Amino acid sequence: MGRPVGQTNQAQPSVQHTASPSNKVSHNGGIGKPANIPTGIPVNYQQTQNQWSSQLFDCMNDSENAVITLIAPCVTFGQIAEIVDEGATPCATAGLLYGALFFTGASFVYSYMFRARIRKKFGLPDAPAPDWITHLVCMPFALCQEYRELKHHGFDPILGWAGNVQQAQQQEMMTPPTGQRMMG
């Protein structure tokens, strides 16, 4: 027997049930028991965050920098700013601006933003306090910690951005290729 007149040979779209707070999906796709729907987060997942390589008050880990920061914090800040800005802000410019703000008591407003950028770049916690508080209350300690952190990540703030780039290029050129064998 044939089809009744007026019906086509097209398949009807099937309705799929989705899990929502108001309905439950069973293993066979129908409404019923709740299904084990993955959320994308493993059961034993713990979000980890990198830690600062040194504590806030570990200034004597780099005593030379500690003395420079105590005498002329604008120098340390300028070095940090040049590295964090990837050379866009020269050390002297950042240092002079910091120095001018230092005498008004507002240098922390400028400097804490660089701490926040360092934290973001290296995935560091906002510790021991929010960046602006750390810079307001413990400015020289914060600058020393940031300087040490940059060194920990392979930067030499004394060289500036261009010096670090040049040093990295020289090291790259001197690194022997891996995975090659001698033929012969």
Curated annotation (Swiss-Prot):
Q: Which domain of life is it from?
A: Eukaryota
Query: Quick check: keyword Magnesium in the entry?
Result: no
Region of interest (Disordered), ranges: 1-33
Q: Where is the composition biased (Polar residues)?
A: 1-26
Q: Name the keywords, alphabetized.
A: Membrane, Transmembrane, Transmembrane helix
From the Swiss-Prot or TrEMBL record, state where the protein is found. Answer: Membrane
The family this protein is said to belong to: Belongs to the cornifelin family.
| Function field | May be involved in heavy metals transport.
Extract the NCBIfam families matched here.
A_thal_Cys_rich (TIGR01571)
Q: What is this protein called?
A: Protein PLANT CADMIUM RESISTANCE 5
* Organism from which the protein derives: Arabidopsis thaliana
Gene name of the encoded protein: PCR5
